[in-house]
Every structure is written in structure tokens, then in C-alpha cells.
């Protein structure tokens, strides 16, 4: 019997979860732009938020998620996240996933805007790496297509039936399937300062848009408050869990920054902390994390410690880490239902590239990994309810190409996006930026031109959404508006 084919674009936790739940009965292929180890999931430090402790409940997790999201979240999506979260965690543990423990119980960390500790972690601050590796090692019966950049979703009779890709030598490869799942992550590389992997440049968002998928809430981009900052450049994330363990944000003179800003001070929602730090930096102040209150810092955060040592940060002596906000996570994305379905038959989206309404205007810390797990399970459950007979498709060529495209320099584009669509925004600047974008073409005959084109399309979608939302909300901060 010929198996139905599932094509998954993206090698992170959401795509790997879906693949794991489908591989026994489906012909599953994972396509990834780089190597399978290169994803935002591998970089995730903090952990997975889930109501698994005796003192916690899904209702409390629901409340924290909604408040952090400025009540812009969708009720059913958040309810699915927080109620299925504990079950997904127990399933993983039963399958052999080992989360950190303390005194025989799960060790739970505290992060911003959570009312109590509920963050499961492993390897201290290397949860994403350990969890992604755990899932990938279980994928014993799938096809991996590494170093293949997806450049076009193939449609027939208004349904998605495949993906065109380019390899490192810009040779075209085509993969057909009855189910196409986008799990390609967000858009961090649109910005010059980001926590994201080098491969994350809005590809899936642009592909979906060009295919006719609906995208929503694109103006809501979370900027993480604390990236390691040195000599004008950022060198990786300093997890929010560091503040959860007691670190404080301070100025060079040692004065506290967040004390009078929000009742939760250093553990306020990320949009508030990032905007506050950005204002400090705009005023000419350097910003640091004071880790004096964490005596076991090196043991609790081995990954961060290694990164600090690699960049010769004298944190053991100074108890300070220089930090700066940077692009971290897209709350919006491809509109989906609770099963990951888009408005295009045969096309699904899960993880950061998708927007089921879980995060609202600002994501609650460590809800991202939970989302990847829950929605990876849900899309697999739905696909299992569908019966589609596999058919051979006639070879469908790549859409018409512009032979001599006019595209901007990537660094210039990143700088303009940061100036226009960064932590604070001005409507007149956004209008100018949209006009500037009209000078350029779309092209995808090489990986380089395809990536810049995807960045242009994604930036345009963000700018248009930002201009439509005339008042500030969550991570979207229009300077003339009132921040809610």
C-alpha cells in the first residue's frame, strides 16, 4: 500500500514533533534550509512552560498568557495550549525525555509575567538543544533533505501539493505531498540584532503569502530584553531565567532600572522590559544584568557561562553582563485553526511561523516551546483523520523568473527594518519605508536572491500591519499612541 506523503519545511521542535507522530503510517520528508541542527529550537534556553506543579493549574497559566498577550489572544487557542501542555509533557517524559529535577521533583524555573515557577528545563539552560536532539534521534523512519531552501509552494486546483527548493549550488529540487506543513520559524534575521539562527529570515511567511495564505498580527514582534552585547554587536541570548533566578537590570552606576516601571520589576512582560531598556540606551546609558544574587550561576546556566567565557566577559569578577534588546519572536504569522490548517487546502503551519492566536500582542516567556509541542501533536492528529489517495503529479515548473532582479543590499535592508519596525515605530517612517520597498523586485532563482526577496515580502507585511494599528498594543509601539 502506498503511503500518503507529508512534506515538512523546518527541522525544529514543531516539525519534528509532527514527524514523530506521523512517521509510522506516512511517508514523511523534512526539508531544512541548513543542517537539521540549525534552528531556533536548538538555541532556546529558558525551557517549556506548563502547569505541572501541585500549586499550579491550567487556569493560572491561561490567565498569565492572556495578561502577557494584552488580551489580544484567542480564548480557544490559549485553552488548548495550557490544557494539553501538561499531557504533552507527561507523554515526552514517558518516552524518555529527561527534564532537570531537584529533590526527586521536576525543577521548575520562574520567568517574566508568570505568577509562579512553571518552566521545565534540561541541561540547565540548554532545553531547546536537548529537546530537539531527543526528538530528532527518534525520527528513524523519515527522509531528511538538508541544505534545501524552500522557495515556492506548488499549487494545483487551489490546493498545496508540493514545494520547490534550491540546494547550495542553486539546483532546483521538487517534493510533492498530500500534506505540506510549514514549520520554518520566524523572521529574526530581518533585524541586525537578533537571537535567531542565521537561517531564520521569514521564508515560510513569504512562501505562504505568495501561495495565497492569510497572515495576521504581523505587527507583533517580540524583542527580547537581554542579548549579550559587546563592542556594538550582539552575541547570543541571555535567558529570562537568569532574571527569574534573581538577576537585576542596572545602569553603569548600579542603579536599578525596572523597580519603578512595573509591579513585577525585572520580571515584567518582555515588551515592557525591552522598551524600557531601549529608552535607556537611547538616552546614552549602558545596561547590565547584575547576577550577584545567583551564587550558583555557572552550574545553573552552563550554556550561557560558556558563551560569556568565549567572549571574555569578566562576569565572575564584575557580576555584570552587558545586554541589549534584540528581535526574538513573531507573535503573528500564517493564520491557522487549532489543528494548524490554513485557508489553503493541503497546507498547514505550526510553531512560530503560524498564528493560531496563542500569544496575542506579546508572548509569555517559554510558551513558544510549549506551542511547538502542542500544535505539532495537533496537526498530526488532524492529518490522521484525512484519507487522500497519493497520485503522481505532472512536473510543475517554477513560476516566471525576473532575470535581472533589482534587490537591496541585505545589511542595508536589515538596518532600515530596525529603524522603521524596531522596538518603537513612527507612522511617517513606516510610510516612507513602504514607498522605498516599491523600488525592488521579487526573485528566487538563487538562494541569495530568494532570501532577500523573502525578507522584502515579510517586511512589507509587517509594515502594512503596523500602519493599520494606529495605537500601541503589547509589542507594537507607535510613538504617537498610548501604550496599553
From Swiss-Prot:
GO terms for molecular function: L-aspartate oxidase activity; nucleotide binding; steroid dehydrogenase activity, acting on the CH-CH group of donors. One of its GO terms (biological process) is 'de novo' NAD biosynthetic process from L-aspartate. FAD binds at residues 11-14, 33, 40-47, 203, 352, 368-369. It is found in: Cytoplasm. It catalyses: L-aspartate + O2 = iminosuccinate + H2O2. The lineage of its organism: Bacteria, Bacillati, Bacillota, Bacilli, Bacillales. This is L-aspartate oxidase. Keywords: Cytoplasm, FAD, Flavoprotein, Nucleotide-binding, Oxidoreductase, Pyridine nucleotide biosynthesis. The keyword Cytoplasm applies. Binds 1 FAD per subunit. InterPro entries: FAD-dep_OxRdtase_2_FAD-bd, FAD/NAD-bd_sf, Fum_R/Succ_DH_flav-like_C_sf, Fum_Rdtase/Succ_DH_flav-like_C, NadB, Succ_DH/fumarate_Rdtase_cat_sf. Its cofactor is FAD. The record marks 111 as: Important in orienting the L-aspartate substrate. Catalyzes the oxidation of L-aspartate to iminoaspartate, the first step in the de novo biosynthesis of NAD(+). Belongs to the FAD-dependent oxidoreductase 2 family. NadB subfamily. The keyword Oxidoreductase applies. It comes from the Bacteria.
Amino acid at each position: 500500500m502506498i503511503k500518503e506523503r507529508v512534506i515538512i519545511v523546518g527541522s525544529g521542535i514543531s516539525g519534528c514533533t509532527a514527524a514523530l507522530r506521523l512517521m509510522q503510517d506516512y511517508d514523511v520528508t523534512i526539508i531544512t534550509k541548513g543542517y537539521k541542527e540549525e534552528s531556533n529550537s536548538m538555541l532556546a534556553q529558558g525551557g517549556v512552560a506548563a502547569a505541572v506543579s501541585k500549586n499550579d493549574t491550567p487556569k493560572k497559566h491561561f490567565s498569565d498568557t492572556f495578561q502577557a498577550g494584552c488580551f489580544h489572544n484567542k480564548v480557544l487557542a490559549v485553552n488548548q495550549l495550557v490544557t494539553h501542555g501538561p499531557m504533552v509533557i507527561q507523554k515526552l517524559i514517558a518516552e524518555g525525555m529527561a527534564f532537570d529535577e531537584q529533590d526527586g521533583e521536576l525543577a521548575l524555573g520562574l520567568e517574566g509575567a508568570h505568577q509562579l515557577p512553571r518552566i521545565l528545563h534540561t541541561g540547565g539552560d540548554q532545553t531547546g538543544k536537548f529537546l530537539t536532539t531527543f526528538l530528532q534521534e527518534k525520527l528513524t523512519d523519515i527522509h531528511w533533505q538538508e541544505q534545501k531552501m524552500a522557495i515556492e509552494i506548488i499549487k494545483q486546483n487551489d490546493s498545496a501539493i508540493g514545494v520547490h527548493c534550491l540546494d547550495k549550488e542553486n539546483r532546483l529540487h521538487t517534493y510533492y505531498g498530500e500534506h505540506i506543513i510549514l514549520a520554518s520559524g520566524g523572521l529574526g534575521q530581518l533585524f541586525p540584532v537578533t537571537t535567531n539562527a542565521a537561517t531564520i529570515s521569514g521564508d515560510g511567511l513569504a512562501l505562504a503569502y505568495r501561495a495565497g495564505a492569510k497572515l495576521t498580527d504581523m505587527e507583533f514582534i517580540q524583542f527580547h530584553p537581554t542579548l549579550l552585547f559587546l563592542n556594538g554587536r550582539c552575541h547570543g541570548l541571555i535567558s529570562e531565567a537568569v532574571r527569574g533566578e534573581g538577576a537585576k537590570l542596572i545602569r553603569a552606576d548600579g542603579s536599578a532600572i525596572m523597580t519603578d516601571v512595573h509591579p513585577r520589576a525585572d520580571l515584567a512582560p518582555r515588551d515592557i522590559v525591552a522598551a524600557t531598556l531601549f529608552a535607556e540606551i537611547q538616552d546614552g546609558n549602558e545596561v547590565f544584568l547584575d547576577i550577584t544574587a545567583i551564587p550558583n550561576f555557572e552550574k545553573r546556566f552552563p550554556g550561557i557561562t560558556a558563551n560569556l567565557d568565549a567572549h571574555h566577559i569578566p562576569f565572575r569578577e564584575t557580576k555584570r553582563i552587558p545586554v541589549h534588546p534584540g528581535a526574538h519572536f513573531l507573535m503573528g504569522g500564517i493564520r491557522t485553526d487549532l489543528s494548524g490548517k490554513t485557508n489553503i487546502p493541503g497546507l498547514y503551519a505550526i510553531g512560530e511561523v503560524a498564528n493560531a492566536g496563542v500569544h496575542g500582542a506579546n508572548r509569555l516567556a517559554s510558551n513558544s516551546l510549549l506551542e511547538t509541542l502542542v500544535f505539532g501533536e495537533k496537526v498530526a492528529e488532524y492529518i490522521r483523520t484525512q484519507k487522500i489517495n497519493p497520485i503522481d503529479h505532472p512536473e510543475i515548473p517554477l513560476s516566471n523568473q525576473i532575470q535581472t532582479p533589482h534587490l537591496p543590499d541585505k545589511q542595508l535592508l536589515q538596518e532600515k527594518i530596525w529603524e522603521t519596525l524596531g522596538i518603537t515605530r513612527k507612522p511617517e517612517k513606516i510610510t516612507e519605508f513602504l514607498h522605498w520597498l516599491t523600488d525592488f523586485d521579487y526573485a528566487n532563482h538563487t538562494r541569495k536572491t530568494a532570501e532577500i526577496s523573502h525578507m522584502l515580502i515579510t517586511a512589507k507585511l509587517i509594515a502594512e500591519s503596523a500602519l493599520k494599528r494606529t495605537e500601541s498594543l503589547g509589542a507594537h509601539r507607535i510613538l504617537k499612541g498610548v501604550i496599553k
